[in-house]
Amino acid sequence: MKRSSTIFLQVVIVLIGLGALALLLWEPHIEGRNAHSTLVQTYFHDPFLAYAYIASIAFFVVLYQTFKVLGYVRQDKVFSQEVVRALRTIKVCAIAIIGFVAGAEIFITLSNSDDRSGGVFMGVLITFGAVVIATAAAMFERILENAVAVKSENDLTV
């Protein structure tokens, strides 16, 4: 992969992270029920918001690990144990995101709100994306583990 392509992808990853962080910090202020609340009321009295912030940690870890993998690609270290570890972390975080979204879906279903369809639909979309990412990361992890093993065997033979 060209150096400019990996740098472009790393910039995209950083922009996605900044956009997600801005949304996490800005969205509670424009939500209807928090329009006239103080900062303390907005951020510390909503358990669902705290849950969303805790769940977002896994998302940001995935972004960081993806950034690291792209750095290894740029350095031509694709077939290394570091990439395998980063892919394993991405897989575990994607599974954690699935668990967090499932917990949020249960919370939405059990709450006494009138309109649950939007939240449930967003949860299904996020779960689908996380399943795809976890599956792809597991597949690439397995392929790279085998490639690293073959490479280490070839390095030992003279």
Show which residues each predicted segment covers:
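Membrane-helix interface/capping segments
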Residues: 61-81
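Membrane-cytosol interface motif
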Residues: 78-89, 151-158
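Alpha-helical transmembrane segments and their membrane-interface junctions
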Residues: 98-114
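Membrane-helix boundary elements
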Residues: 37-63
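Alpha-helical transmembrane segments and their immediate juxtamembrane interface regions
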Residues: 121-152
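Alpha-helical transmembrane segments of multi-pass membrane proteins
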Residues: 18-31, 134
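Alpha-helical transmembrane segments and their helix-start/interface "positive-inside/aromatic belt" motifs
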Residues: 1-17
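Non-cytosolic membrane-interface motifs at loop->transmembrane helix junctions
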Residues: 39-42, 116-125
